[in-house]
Amino acid sequence: MKVAVIGAAGGIGQALALLLKNRLPAGSDLALYDIAPVTPGVAADLSHIPTPVSIKGYAGEDPTPALEGADVVLISAGVARKPGMDRADLFNVNAGIVKSLAEKIAVVCPTACVGIITNPVNTTVPIAAEVLKKAGVYDKRKLFGVTTLDVIRSETFVAELKDKDPGDVRVPVIGGHSGVTILPLLSQVEGVEFTAEEVEALTKRIQNAGTEVVEAKAGGGSATLSMGQAACRFGLALVRALQGEEGVVECAYVEGDSEHASYFAQPVKLGKDGVEEVLSYGALSDYEKSALDGMLETLNGDINIGVEFAK
């Protein structure tokens, strides 16, 4: 099993690489790529950790050696958010980066499962899909927007509020991966009750959690460590499913058969070919129905920007 981390010298990439070096199954290969010359050094540093995972790092303009033979590609390349920026401000730089990486993937490892972390995810995933479609290698079961950070934040905040073990809390999060498009389904959390005020406050906190971190870091970056953890959780779930484990379910932003938008985050069952089944997100509360209706114009607008950019 080969996993490639693209953008591996950045804050998310280094955190993700550290976690994967520790947690990938024995015998796995971990490849790190970044344009930054430090990348082989990041791999050398991580190679001293005593786990049965081999690691190599590649720098420069060409990600080909990292992508060759990859089963899973996790893309965190791009610029990070600064105070005052929203995820859409990242588009101008990151859209081009994702487009060129997707063009490489189409040639070098067209059958790999690709998880996109680079923001704005609502838009970068459609860009990658359009590139892969043009190349004739698109498989919608194998392209994911990684929205797991919204899930782990939801689990953490609910556990804090209700004095639960976060490991026992499950919160499906649907929609997209920015602002109002993030919709945690708090009505489906088992074993807890929320007041209307709690639902509203929690939903807003989850939607704005990225900004909370950007502001707390005071210009020094965005959510890198928690995002690394979220991407690791998603990447490991993919690896387990590809290796034949049954019943692996995570939320992800995929091209499915959603009636709401051509790309939509919801629970997906993972299997040996990527998405085995897009699962129903179940019954919504009135608050959630209203929030879903209210986000769709934004979400569909984000998707269209990506499709147009890739033309």
From Swiss-Prot:
Chain sites annotated for binding substrate: 81, 87, 119, 153
InterPro entries for the chain: L-lactate/malate_DH, Lactate/malate_DH_C, Lactate/malate_DH_N, Lactate_DH/Glyco_Ohase_4_C, Malate_DH_AS, Malate_DH_type1, Malate_DH_type1_bac, NAD(P)-bd_dom_sf
Positions annotated to bind NAD(+): 7-13, 34, 94, 117-119, 227
EC number(s) recorded for this UniProt protein: 1.1.1.37
GO BP terms: malate metabolic process; tricarboxylic acid cycle
Assembly mode: Homodimer.
Protein name: Malate dehydrogenase
Species of provenance: Vibrio campbellii (strain ATCC BAA-1116)
